[in-house]
């Protein structure tokens, strides 16, 4: 994601414009998780979009490759993946907004506390929505440098390209660093980007503290079943399976991990069938814990390249048996992913009804919009600050979940 400062205003009020810029800076400073991201939407794409709706990003089809001179053209299958459009806001009276004319006082008493609070709420939601969108998992009994190495290696096995970032709980990073802080290689650019949360580079990944990461508690052993619907060719041979994005079972919780006993393996982003096992991670569950959403799995039969696949199975295998990978207990959760796997865009949505005197500021790719509203009941004006954005991991192959036993 490009990092830059820019200001656009609908008024000539320099003071308001400067204030919004300070708030935008305070928000951007707290969003470490999305600093490593790429843009997937343009301002034009945001036109007419509403908060809470989803936007489709398309995963390109790499097609199939044949050896020799004979060509065998195949259809192009672009896969849609949803990115949610969201908004976070904070508001205050115009008196509170205008009370502090001195920029330093305004920064300390308004921009920084409100910007930080807004940003942390926003960041926590983005983290919770995306930390389990992974196709691989590394599970360990204790924090160690080996955990960081294993997670980076899992990505390397898929030959993913680009910058790799690692987000772990500060407690986890503290325990790892106690075993040899000198193992972290400092990087000037990353230090400037992530500030005090940056530890250094290890195993090819920038290591970053993230206090907003969740924990996962397994109270009762979860069980799960996955239903596969075959896709047939003209001769009734199974060449793949319809996309799967749900599982059923018992004691399901967000973050639960299941394996398929080596029967389900990853097709990497270049279309190569790898030997890396797919780990199925629960994204969300129904209240009873009997049905769960998972990252979409597009399965092809070995050598068939059906439906822009991200996973493959051997011919003749048409069922999968899932086994829980997590024992009963509580786990710290971390994530190692590529910068390119996270899409983040923040632009000015359509104006809200009844608003006026709008100012917009962008810092670090994060846009903050200020609007004023009349409060007819109390005969006063309100200042509202909005951060409209779209964020999401659009391809789970670019991310690895890390589970470290806490208790």
Regions inferred by a protein language model and the residue ranges of each:
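N-terminal "assembly arms/tails" that initiate or stabilize quaternary assembly
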Residues: 1-80, 399, 403-405
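Short, Lys/Arg-rich flexible segments
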Residues: 2-41, 93-105, 119-139, 391, ...
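Hydrophobic, glycine-enriched assembly/anchoring segments
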Residues: 5, 92-95, 366-407
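Long, contiguous amphipathic alpha-helices that act as assembly "spine/axial" helices in icosahedral shell
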Residues: 57, 81-147, 153-172, 195-206, ...
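Autoprocessing Asn-cyclization modules and mimics
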Residues: 174-297, 403-407
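A sequence-level detector for low-complexity, Ser/Thr- and acidic-rich stretches
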Residues: 214, 225-227, 231, 267-273, ...
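Short solvent-exposed strand/turn elements
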Residues: 286-321
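C-terminal hydrophobic structural anchor segments
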Residues: 329-366
């Amino acid at each position: 994601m490009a990092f830059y400062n820019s200001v656009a205003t609908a008024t000539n009020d320099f003071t308001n414009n400067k204030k919004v810029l300070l708030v935008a800076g305070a928000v951007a400073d707290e969003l470490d998780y999305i600093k490593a991201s790429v843009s997937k939407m343009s301002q034009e794409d945001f036109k007419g979009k509403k908060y809470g709706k989803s936007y489709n990003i398309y995963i390109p089809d790499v097609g199939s490759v044949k050896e020799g001179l004979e060509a065998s053209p195949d259809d192009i299958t672009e896969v849609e993946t949803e990115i949610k459009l969201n908004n976070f806001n904070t508001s205050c009276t115009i008196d509170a907004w205008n009370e502090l004319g001195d920029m330093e006082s305004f920064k300390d008493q308004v921009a920084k506390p409100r910007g930080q609070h807004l940003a942390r709420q926003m960041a926590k939601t983005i983290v919770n929505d995306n930390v389990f969108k992974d196709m691989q998992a590394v599970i360990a009994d204790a924090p160690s440098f080996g955990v960081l190495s294993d997670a980076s290696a899992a990505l390397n096995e898929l030959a993913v390209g680009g910058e790799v970032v690692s987000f772990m709980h500060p407690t986890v990073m503290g325990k790892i660093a106690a075993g040899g802080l000198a193992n972290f290689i400092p990087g000037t650019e990353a230090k400037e980007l992530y500030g005090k949360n940056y530890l250094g580079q290890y195993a090819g990944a920038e290591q970053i503290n993230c206090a907003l990461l969740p924990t996962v508690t397994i109270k009762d052993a979860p069980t799960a079943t996955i239903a596969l619907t075959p896709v047939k060719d003209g001769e009734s041979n199974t060449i793949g399976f319809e996309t799967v994005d749900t599982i059923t079972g018992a004691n399901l919780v967000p973050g639960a991990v299941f394996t398929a006993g080596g029967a389900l393996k990853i097709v990497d982003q270049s279309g190569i069938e790898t030997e890396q096992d797919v780990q199925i991670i629960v994204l969300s569950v129904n209240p009873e814990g009997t049905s769960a959403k998972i990252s979409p799995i597009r399965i092809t039969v070995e050598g068939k390249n059906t439906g822009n696949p991200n996973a493959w199975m051997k011919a003749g295998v048409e069922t999968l048996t899932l086994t829980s990978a997590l024992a009963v207990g509580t786990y710290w959760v971390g994530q190692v992913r590529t910068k390119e796997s996270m899409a983040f865009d923040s632009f000015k949505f359509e104006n809200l009804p009844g608003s006026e005197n709008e100012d917009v500021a962008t810092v670090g790719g994060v846009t903050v919009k200020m609007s004023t509203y009349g409060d007819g009941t109390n005969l006063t004006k309100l200042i509202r600050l909005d951060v409209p954005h779209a964020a999401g991991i659009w391809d789970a192959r670019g991310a690895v979940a890390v589970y470290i036993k806490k208790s």
